[in-house]
């Protein structure tokens, strides 16, 4: 397999094993195009992968992800792995996992849901992880992957 030539980062996060074509969505939902710390963001798309065939990789310099951000990644790229980098070394590595309950990340697709016109934190229960399907706590609307991605 040909070698992938991408420079290492000193401090930050590498999001690996993103399904091919989903890297831009990961950058978008994490707001990485608006980094205020001056760190760089690198997106490698459609690179060879033994596990996935093809994958995307996102490297973020100078940023460490919160639990909420990791949960957002799980909704878009459930196969992703997050690597925490300090002094050019991986100090922590974990797979993202879709939580059983999703709070405050997702908007409900039902225009009549109370969360769309009152100041109420959204809450969804995961019905299925593959394919991804969630149900709103308030109006009980069920949303599938395409609608979930549109409402992140």
Swiss-Prot record:
Biological-process GO terms, alphabetical: 'de novo' pyrimidine nucleobase biosynthetic process; pyrimidine nucleotide biosynthetic process
In terms of superkingdom, the source organism counts as Archaea
Q: Which HAMAP family match?
A: Asp_carb_tr_reg
Species name for this entry? Pyrococcus horikoshii (strain ATCC 700860 / DSM 12428 / JCM 9974 / NBRC 100139 / OT-3)
Q: Does the keyword Zinc apply?
A: yes
Q: Listed GO molecular functions?
A: metal ion binding
Q: Name one Pfam family in it.
A: PyrI_C
PANTHER family, A to Z: ASPARTATE CARBAMOYLTRANSFERASE REGULATORY CHAIN
Task: Name it.
Answer: Aspartate carbamoyltransferase regulatory chain
GO CC annotation, single? aspartate carbamoyltransferase complex
Concerning its family, UniProt says: Belongs to the PyrI family.
Which keywords fit this entry according to its UniProt record?
A: Metal-binding, Pyrimidine biosynthesis, Zinc
Question: Which cofactors, if any, are listed as required?
Answer: Zn(2+)
Q: Does the keyword Metal-binding apply?
A: yes
Gene name of the record = pyrI
Its function, per the record, reads: Involved in allosteric regulation of aspartate carbamoyltransferase.
The free-text note explaining how the cofactor binds reads:
Binds 1 zinc ion per subunit.
* Coiled-coil ranges from the UniProt annotation: none
Detail which positions bind Zn(2+). 108, 113, 136, 139
Quaternary organization: Contains catalytic and regulatory chains.
